[in-house]
């Protein structure tokens, strides 16, 4: 490992497995961001972190967003991923500073795009998202957040306010040395197309979704 003065003006630790390649301005509909591009030499993935404003080291508003082509790009209502990404970018911009780490290689909770589509086909036949993965002989959740922790480390971030409903993300960051000062809910109103999926995330994957009961009553009425 070597130390360097990063683009943000902080001394950061450069780890050889995740290398910062480029920084560029990225104006968006939510506000002005900077895109920090990284290459993960261990996995061969290209990664990006969108940074808004001037970051401190502590309690940085942060979203770790697993890539979801169907939700983020196509507006799929099978999940709430696209709406969560938009909400996270908006909240970071409104807060004046923060980070959205967009995690490539996390498609379908880490099983890949084609496997995810196969799992979605099984869900259309009546299996839930957990049962579908297992029926395909795949892990329920294969995501690793080590690269996210190394990106935060490169940006000089030691603790975060984590926008997530998933306790496993918090646990993973803590294991990798990033303190989670607060877990900030990122709740999206469900629709008829994703209510079963969200219920499974709550009941089988331990996601914190306190708004779901009232929403389920509304959807079924």
UniProtKB/Swiss-Prot annotation:
- Binding site residues for GTP: 63-67, 84, 107-109, 129, 164, 169
Tell me any Pfam family this protein matches.
Answer: GTP_cyclohydro2
| Ligand binding (Zn(2+)) | 68, 79, 81
Question: Pathway involvement?
Answer: Cofactor biosynthesis; riboflavin biosynthesis; 5-amino-6-(D-ribitylamino)uracil from GTP: step 1/4
What does the entry's cofactor note say about binding and number?
Answer: Binds 1 zinc ion per subunit.
What keywords are assigned to this protein?
A: GTP-binding, Hydrolase, Metal-binding, Nucleotide-binding, Riboflavin biosynthesis, Zinc
InterPro entries named among the record's database cross-references? GTP_cyclohydro_II, RibA, RibA-like_sf
Q: Does the keyword Hydrolase apply?
A: yes
Q: Which major enzyme category is it?
A: hydrolase
Q: Tell me its cofactors.
A: Zn(2+)
- Catalytic residues in the record: 141, 143
GO CC aspect terms = cytosol
Q: What is its EC number?
A: 3.5.4.25
Query: How far does the signal peptide extend, from start to end residue?
Result: none
Query: GO MF terms on file?
Result: GTP binding; GTP cyclohydrolase II activity; zinc ion binding
Q: Which HAMAP family match?
A: RibA (MF_00179)
Q: What does this protein do?
A: Catalyzes the conversion of GTP to 2,5-diamino-6-ribosylamino-4(3H)-pyrimidinone 5'-phosphate (DARP), formate and pyrophosphate.
Family annotation (PANTHER family): 3,4-DIHYDROXY-2-BUTANONE 4-PHOSPHATE SYNTHASE (PTHR21327:SF18), GTP CYCLOHYDROLASE II-RELATED (PTHR21327)
Q: Which family does it belong to?
A: Belongs to the GTP cyclohydrolase II family.
In its UniProt entry, what is this protein called?
A: GTP cyclohydrolase-2
Q: Which organism is it from?
A: Streptomyces coelicolor (strain ATCC BAA-471 / A3(2) / M145)
């Amino acid at each position: 490992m070597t130390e360097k003065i990063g683009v943000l003006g902080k001394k950061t630790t450069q780890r050889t497995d995740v290398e910062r390649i480029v920084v560029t301005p990225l104006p968006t509909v939510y506000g002005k961001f900077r895109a920090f591009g990284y290459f993960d030499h261990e996995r061969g993935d290209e990664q990006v972190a969108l940074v808004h404003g001037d970051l401190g080291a502590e309690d940085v508003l942060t979203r770790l967003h697993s890539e979801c082509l169907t939700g983020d790009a196509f507006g799929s209502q099978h999940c709430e991923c696209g709406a969560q990404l938009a909400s996270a970018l908006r909240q970071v911009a409104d807060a004046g500073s923060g980070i959205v780490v967009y995690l490539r290689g996390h498609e379908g909770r880490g099983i890949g795009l084609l496997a995810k589509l196969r799992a979605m086909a099984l869900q259309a036949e009546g299996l839930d998202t957990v049962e579908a993965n297992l029926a395909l002989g795949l892990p329920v959740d294969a995501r690793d957040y080590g690269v996210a922790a190394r990106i935060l480390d490169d940006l000089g971030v030691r603790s975060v306010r984590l926008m997530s409903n998933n306790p496993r993300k918090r646990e993973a960051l803590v294991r990798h040395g990033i303190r989670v000062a607060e877990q900030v809910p990122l709740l999206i109103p469900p629709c008829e197309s994703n209510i079963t999926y969200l219920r499974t995330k709550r009941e089988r994957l331990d996601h914190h979704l306190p708004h779901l009961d009232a929403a389920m009553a509304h959807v079924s009425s």
